[in-house]
Amino acid sequence: MKISLVTWLITALCLMEIEEIDGDTPGNYPVDFQGIYYECIVYNRCERDCKIHGASYGYCYAGVCFCEYLPDENKNFWDVMKKQCDYMNN
């Protein structure tokens, strides 16, 4: 009985981990001041670029940066800069 309970618990934990890794994480692909996606094939600066856009984490996916939990209103570089200027002026 204890062995089957332990086996069930380990299986459940493994499935939860797979869900976390393989689950669809909401996010967005940020664009620079020219409206172009940040490329990351040569220089992977996704974490830095995502932090500029207000996201806490980013990584290279299919040759461009993807930022986890990046809202649509922070996707464009100029929208982020405008928010910062508005914040400084108030």
UniProtKB/Swiss-Prot annotation:
Record's subcellular location: Secreted
Keywords, comma-separated and alphabetical: Disulfide bond, Ion channel impairing toxin, Neurotoxin, Secreted, Signal, Toxin, Voltage-gated sodium channel impairing toxin
Role summary: The edited BmKBTx-like may modulate voltage-gated sodium channels (Nav).
One annotated GO molecular function: sodium channel inhibitor activity
Organism name: Tityus serrulatus
Tissue: Expressed by the venom gland.
Family, as annotated: Belongs to the long (3 C-C) scorpion toxin superfamily.
Tagged with keyword Secreted: yes
CDD domains, sorted: neurotoxins_LC_scorpion
Transmembrane segments: none
GO terms for cellular component: extracellular region
Subunit structure and binding partners: Monomer (edited version) and heterodimer (non-edited version) of this alpha chain and a beta chain (AC P0CI43).
A Pfam family per the record: Toxin_3
PROSITE patterns noted in UniProt: LCN_CSAB (PS51863)
Name the record gives this protein: Putative sodium channel toxin Ts28
Cystine residue pairs: C40-C60, C46-C65, C50-C67
Tagged with keyword GTP-binding: no
Signal peptide: 1-23
First-listed, main subcellular location of the protein, grouped into a coarse class: secreted
Gene3D superfamilies membership: Knottin, scorpion toxin-like
InterPro entries assigned: LCN-type_CS_alpha_beta_dom, Scorpion_toxin-like_sf, Scorpion_toxinL/defensin
